[in-house]
Amino acid sequence: MPFGSPWDGRIPQSEIDSIIDAYLDVGITEISLSDTSGMGVPNQVYEMCSHVHTKFPTVSWWLHFHNTRGVAMANIMAAMEAGMTRFDTSFGGLGGCPFVPGAAGNISSEDVIHMCDESGITTGIDVRKVMAISRKVQTILGHTTDSYLLRAGCSSDLLQTVK
């Protein structure tokens, strides 16, 4: 949890760098920076991602943000501004963390895809197909999920009704 731990607080960048060095020493070149506790904030995410992207250019990075405090989307945008391109998401925002009190799931796939679409960032993913899967997930679970897009719909749908 490089963005913050419920037990250790903020983790110094030097400790994170040491862990990354240890991974590289044994041949690991794909590394995920996870915010399972949902403690990360955009300026911290930007600074850390900029740092590791520059210091460790051979690493293939993944980012993993839980939306516990409602800032996962902003954290993704900050990471993208720092050059990161891969993010874990989940249908409907499912998930959680059994050892972090109150932890929400990952940010919903459809919310992130919609944000990218509306921002002109090509993902190659059909947001409506993802929404259909997330609706099926809700049906299977028997309750709503944390997807904003399933509640509000695509911006383009709203714009069509205004015209």
Q: Which residues are covered by each model-predicted region?
A:
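Catalytic cores and adjacent flexible loops of soluble metabolic enzymes
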Residues: M1-K163
